[in-house]
């Protein structure tokens, strides 16, 4: 009998142990998503981030700096500039337009923009057409003590908090030379966006449609239906675009087919295919429109700055402090170097050398990372590089214009209703 009672007691203890173990396992599953790993050094921004809006310091002057040439692009960008003016609750005290065109229609459009708010918009007419090795002349117009947000004229979309986030990062980190935005269609960021899950499967529609929706929601991918084709279909990135004008790319319903789409060829590279392929850029743009529609911009964002060290980043959308540029003796920049070469490669490298030789009190890691960083929460979309000519045959310019009118343009240029 004693043996039997002993067995029962052992069984009772085993049951209690099993119950306790199950409880802790279950509790662990509940808690784990809420407790980040101590070794986790990279955190994407949570969806519906509830951080308080950034407040512009009273003693800070922020100027937009735009190298202007094309009405077809700026007709969309104009809405985002208006949203970001201090008059409308934004951070831009002024916008400086560097005119680099002789086209009468383009010039007339810019005059219209400036006339709408001459207090905030200023025009500088270059004495000659500027190109890669003469853009340095535009940087002479910076004024000391100001922060400048340089915006290419084919930036077609700017997230509402992008400029505040870039400028704040620069203010808080004065040793950083350049703060770049997290830009759609700016290698090598496309590779990162792909690996972070921000890009989706799209293919060009197989033939010209007989009817296309043309309402205010034209920009939304959901309004155009799914792509219809064989599951084995692929699109060679060297393939030319469809021949008809304003062709569409449509969402592929099967997510698994993304491996057959152009973005599957993305690499962490500055030039080559990731830079040249119009089809990759096209797919990135349509993916952005989908993410805006689905309120999924968190897919692109990250909190820790991405340091470029001595890698190039294109200067499509970035923040600099005027004194940092003016102290570099712009007039004597090497004549065989473009402004991008100087601002994101040569000047930061020289700055690091000077700090190291002067025995700067800054930690070595900070000195090494003082060059160029990506602000992961400053999203913007850059339309096109010269090698991406096929983009012009898509309906993307039309879609970005529809997006601006539907979501971002202020009524009569008035204050934001946010």
Feature names for model-found ranges:
Residues 3-45, 56-58, 77, 232-418:
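C-terminal catalytic/acceptor-binding lobe
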Residues 46-51, 70-88:
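Short, well-formed alpha-helical segments that are part of the catalytic scaffolds
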Residues 62-71:
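A conserved hydrophobic helix/loop-capping motif in glycosyltransferases and polysaccharide synthases
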Residues 66, 93-96, 111-112, 116-122, ...:
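Long, low-complexity intrinsically disordered regions enriched in Ser/Thr/Pro/Gly
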Residues 145, 156, 160-172, 228, ...:
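Short alpha-helix within the catalytic core of nucleotide-sugar-dependent glycosyltransferases
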């Amino acid at each position: 009998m004693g043996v039997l009672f002993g067995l029962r007691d052992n069984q009772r203890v085993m049951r209690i142990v099993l119950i306790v173990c199950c409880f802790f396992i279950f509790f662990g599953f509940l808690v784990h998503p809420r407790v980040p790993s101590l070794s986790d050094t990279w955190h994407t921004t949570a969806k519906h981030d509830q951080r308080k809006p950034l407040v512009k310091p009273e003693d800070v002057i922020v100027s937009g700096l735009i190298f202007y040439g094309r009405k077809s692009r700026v007709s969309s960008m104009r809405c985002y500039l208006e949203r970001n003016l201090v008059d409308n609750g934004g951070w831009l005290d002024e916008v400086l337009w560097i005119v680099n065109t002789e086209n009468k229609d383009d010039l007339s459009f810019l005059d219209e923009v400036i006339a709408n708010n001459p207090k905030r918009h200023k025009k500088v007419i270059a004495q000659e057409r500027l190109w890669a090795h003469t853009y340095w002349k535009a940087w002479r117009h910076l004024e000391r003590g100001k922060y400048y947000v340089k915006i290419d004229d084919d930036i077609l979309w700017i997230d509402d908090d992008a400029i505040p986030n870039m400028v704040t990062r620069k203010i808080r980190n004065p040793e950083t030379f350049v703060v770049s935005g997290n830009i759609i269609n700016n290698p090598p960021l496309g590779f990162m966006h792909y690996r972070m899950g921000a890009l989706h499967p799209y293919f060009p529609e197989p033939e010209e449609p007989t009817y296309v929706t043309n309402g205010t929601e034209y920009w939304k991918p959901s309004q155009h239906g799914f792509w219809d084709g064989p599951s084995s279909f692929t699109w060679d990135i060297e393939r030319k675009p469809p021949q008809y004008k304003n062709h569409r790319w449509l969402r592929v319903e099967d997510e698994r087919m993304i491996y057959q789409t152009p973005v599957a060829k993305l690499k962490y590279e500055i030039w080559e295919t990731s830079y040249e392929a119009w089809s990759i850029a096209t797919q990135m743009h349509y993916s952005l429109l989908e993410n805006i529609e689905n309120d999924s911009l968190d897919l692109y964002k990250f909190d820790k700055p991405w340091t470029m060290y001595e890698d190039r980043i294109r200067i499509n959308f970035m923040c600099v402090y005027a004194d940092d540029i003016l102290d570099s003796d712009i007039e004597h920049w090497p004549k065989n170097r473009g402004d991008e070469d100087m601002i994101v490669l040569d000047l930061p490298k020289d700055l690091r050398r000077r700090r190291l030789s002067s025995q700067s009190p800054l930690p070595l890691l900070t000195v090494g990372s003082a060059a160029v960083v990506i602000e992961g929460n400053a999203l913007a979309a850059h339309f096109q590089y010269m090698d991406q000519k096929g983009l012009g045959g898509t309906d993307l310019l039309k879609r970005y214009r529809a997006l601006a009118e539907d979501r971002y343009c202020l009524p009569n240029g008035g204050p934001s209703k946010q």
